[in-house]
Amino acid sequence: MKVTLIAIPTCAAVLVLHTTAAEELEESQLMEVGMPDTELAAVDEERLFECSVSCEIEKEGNKDCKKKKCKGGWKCKFNMCVKV
């Protein structure tokens, strides 16, 4: 009986500590608000600019606008790089 009375609180304490550690790990893996968004926006703007400028140059040379291959999961659509 004494073993059962000791085991129950011990298991409860271990469960609480495990849950707390899991929550802390999850929070540490979440993206920070603000800073990464601005970095991604800058990358998006660069990709949009690169693709549209490339197509405009090709059009001025009396050639069909060939789609520029965007790298990293992006593709050129309507003179813009869009995420696939």
Curated annotation (Swiss-Prot):
Q: Where in the cell is it found?
A: Secreted
Give a GO cellular-component term. Answer: host cell postsynaptic membrane
Q: What InterPro entries does the record tag this protein with?
A: Hwtx-2-like
**GO MF, one annotated term:** toxin activity
> Any signal peptide, and if so, which residues?
1-22
What is the tissue specificity? Expressed by the venom gland.
Keywords recorded for this protein, A-Z: Disulfide bond, Neurotoxin, Postsynaptic neurotoxin, Secreted, Signal, Toxin
Q: What residues does the annotated propeptide cover?
A: 23-47
* Classification via SUPFAM superfamilies: omega toxin-like
> Which purpose does this protein serve, as stated in its record?
Postsynaptic neurotoxin.
Q: Which family does it belong to?
A: Belongs to the neurotoxin 12 (Hwtx-2) family. 02 (Hwtx-2) subfamily.
Q: What is this protein called?
A: U4-theraphotoxin-Hhn1a
Task: Give the species this sequence originates from.
Answer: Cyriopagopus hainanus
Q: What is the lineage of its organism?
A: Eukaryota, Metazoa, Ecdysozoa, Arthropoda, Chelicerata
